[in-house]
Amino acid sequence: MQPALTTAIPARKFKLTLLGPAFIAAIGYIDPGNFATNIQAGSTFGYQLLWVVVWANLMAMLVQTLSAKLGIVTGKNLAEHIRDRLPKPAVWAYWVQAEIIAMATDLAEFIGAAVGFKLLLGVTLLEGAGITAVVTWGILMLQSRGQKPLEFVVGGLLLFVAAAYIVELVFSRPHLPSLLEGALFPGLPNSDAVYLAAGVLGATVMPHVIYLHSALTQHTQDQGSVPQRLHTTRVDVAIAMTIAGFVNLAMMAMAAAAFHSSGNQQVAELESAYQTLTPLLGQAAATLFGLSLVASGISSTVVGTLAGQVVMQGFVRFTIPLWLRRAITMAPAFVVIAMGLNTTEILVLSQVVLSFGIALALIPLLILTGDRALMGEYRNHPVTQAVGRLIVALVIGLNAYLLVAMI
C-alpha cells in the first residue's frame, strides 16, 4: 500500500502546480470598466440586470477554457497561430489592432487605480497615477522570478476584491428574494436597460485576456499529460471565473441595495459612488470600495501589460522589457489626466474601442480549437462549436448595438 500512496501524493501536487493562469485571466473581468458599468446598472435598474452578469460569466468561462486548451494542446498561443496562418500584411494589421486594444484597456485600468488612490488618500489624480505606476512596476518585476510569484500576487488581489465585496454585501444588506429573481429570470424593462445590458456583456468578454490565457498555458508540456492538464485547467477556470462572476454580481447587488433602494438612481461615476456610500453605509464601506478599486486597477493593468507583451511576441516575434512596455502604455494615461478629461468617459470609451477586437479574437479561437488537423482528439465537440458561434453572434451583435448607441 505504501508505494501507491507515495505516487498518489506527487500526482496531487502536480495538478496543484497547474492552477493559477485562470486567476490572471479572471482579473480582466473585474477591471474598473466593470465597476463603472455594474454600479450604473445596479443604481438605475436595481436587481433587474443581474441575470446578464450570470450569463455573461458563463460565456466567459467557455471562452477562457477554449483559450487555455489551445495553448495546452498545441504549445502555441492564439497570436502565434494567427501569425502562422495569415499573410504578413494581415498579421501586422492584426498586431496593430491587438496592441491598440491592449493599450486602450490598460488606459482605463490605470486611471481606475489612480482614481482609487485619489479617493482613499486625498491626493490629486496625477499623484494617484504616480503611485499606481510605482506599484505596478514593482509587481511586474516579479515576472523575472517566473510566472508563479505573479500568479500568487494577482490571485491574491482577486481574492481581496472578492472578500471586500462580501463585506460590502453585509453592509448594504440586499433583498435576497429580489436578488435571486434578478439573477435567475431575464428581463429588460426598457431601451435604457438594453443599452446597459449590452455594456455589461461588452465589459465581460475581454480580447486581451483571450490572447494572454493561451500563452500562460502553452509551456506546460513537462507538467503532466494533456488530459491531466486540460482537467486541471477546467477546474482552474471554474474557480477563478466563479470568483470573478461573484464580484460582478456583488457590485451590481450592492449598487441596487445601497443606491437604487434609497432613491439614488443616477450614480454612474466612481467618485460619486464613493461619496454616496459614505452617508448611506458608513466610511468603512466607502473605504472598502476604494481599496477594491485600487486592487482591481493595479492587478488589471499588470495583466494588460502582460497581454501586450504576448501579442507583440506572438504576432511579430519581437519583445521589449516589461518596464519599458509599462512606461509606454502608461504615457497616454498621464496625458489624459493632465488634460483634465472626465475619467468615467474614458472608461466608457475604452469599452467602445474594446468592442472592435472581440470578434477578431473570438472567431479565430473558435476556428482553431474546432480544427481536427490542429487539435486532433481534443478538437471542440460540435455542441461546443455551436454554443461558441452563438456567443460570437451575441457578443458581436450587442457590442455593435452598444457602439451605434454611443455614436
From Swiss-Prot:
User: What's its membrane topology?
Assistant: Multi-pass membrane protein
One Gene Ontology biological process: iron ion transmembrane transport
**GO cellular component, as recorded:** plasma membrane
Task: Determine if Membrane is one of this entry's keywords.
Answer: yes
Regions that span the bilayer: 16-36, 43-63, 95-115, 119-139, 152-172, 193-213, 239-259, 288-308, 318-338, 346-366, 387-407
Give the Gene Ontology MF terms in alphabetical order: cadmium ion transmembrane transporter activity; manganese ion transmembrane transporter activity; metal ion binding; symporter activity
> Any coiled-coil ranges, and where?
none
Q: Which domain of life is it from?
A: Bacteria
Q: Where in the cell is it found?
A: Cell inner membrane
Record keywords, A-Z = Cell inner membrane, Cell membrane, Ion transport, Membrane, Symport, Transmembrane, Transmembrane helix, Transport
Q: Where is the secretion signal located? A: none
The similarity annotation says: Belongs to the NRAMP family.
* Role of this protein: H(+)-stimulated, divalent metal cation uptake system.
Record-given protein name? Divalent metal cation transporter MntH
Classification from the root reads: Bacteria, Pseudomonadati, Pseudomonadota, Gammaproteobacteria, Aeromonadales
